[in-house]
Amino acid sequence: MTQIIDIEAFRADLSGTALTRGDHGYDEARSAWNGQIDRYPAVIARCRSAADVAAAIAFARQRGLEISVRGGFHNTAGTAICDHGLMIDLSPLHHVEVDPATRRARVGGGATLGELDAATQMHGLAVPAGIISHTGVGGLTLGGGIGWLLPLYGLTVDNLVSAEVVTADGRRLRASADEHPDLFWALRGGGGNFGVVTEFEFRLHPVGPVVHLGLFFWGLDQGTEVLKLGRDLFATLPAHTNAMITSVNAPPAPFVPERFHFMPGYILAIVGFGSAEEHTRVLAPIREALPPLFEFMTPMPYVALQQMFDEGAPWGVSCYEKSLLLDELSDEAIAVITDHQPRKTSPLSMMEVYRFGGAYAEVGEDETAFGGSRSTRFGVFIVGLTDDPESLAAARVWVRSFWEALHQHATDAGSYVNAMADIEEDRVRAAYGPAKYERLARIKAEYDPDNVFHHNANIKPALQPI
């Protein structure tokens, strides 16, 4: 009876709603993008304001409940959802307010990339972000934010101007270069360790609304040639162009000849943010150097580009992934990739090679808390995906074996915290390196000394704060 009275009193304190097991909407609210995640919070607080978030934190702390925070539910490890604790659900806070005159956007902590892109593109503007539209802005930003605009404008965190944060003791703070600069530094890469961000303010850039896409596809037997071609191409692309290498099964899309449907192979995707003429000049040498099995070139809206990979990573798919960073895509690393890629156990599984550099490399190593080195030239993501949950175990073995072999050629022991399916303390420490981790731990001790926010890629508070 006490729990029922507590819940009803808590509900009365919220402008949003509080759900418990059995309530209408509870199961939908606890669902995650990764279908492997199946957890049951004792309470789900669907917060409509920073005051709601503060009330939820106080309610949980008074009752000794573990706290997790949901932005978009897209984290592979499912850290947004806790068992038997209180989940702060920010999805009602999904506003996007754009000021085209100042090129700024204020974005709720529960907004998705699709909502952000749609609002900013109405003004021909964009924030560098990820490549799956149903990803949450919050989690993506706090871990870094890698996407198509990275070489043009950097990471998502490189474009964060300020953040409205509710801390573990219920304070509502604005973090920026001028206010709580230590907290602002930590939020730009340190994940959800320091508080609940209810609103982000981003710097916007002119993008689109039309961009230019080029796709080339080759079979698995040409993997070595494709990866070497991509390596050379990445180094010579013009400033307003980006590219990615992906190893996937060809989709049954209209632009794919039927005989190649579901065929495993390699895609080289080139996106031009400049003129059509410049894009044509970039593509011509590719087909001459290594004629593809098929190709596809088209202008397309930027928002469509941002949704291009949604179908390959649908909501509810079972996922396990690992990532690493490479200074060089050496011949030895290429040999590892071409050896392991044909061994994948699910047709949905994939490997992605991102191009770093450009604006990303122009940011100082210590300007943000982002874990990756700014000298890194390549990011490799090995993603096990399956629509059959029982077959994920085999995909997990493939991912781990692939990662272990490729890790011998990595920049260091680090990886991208947003792509950690296994949240382990040594991996988190390695992602940031000793100096950044120690600095983050001191800031953690200042703003969350009791480690209230630990259901994440956790940074433990230092014994002594700043």
Per-range role (PLM):
Residues M1-I466:
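Soluble FAD-dependent oxygen oxidases
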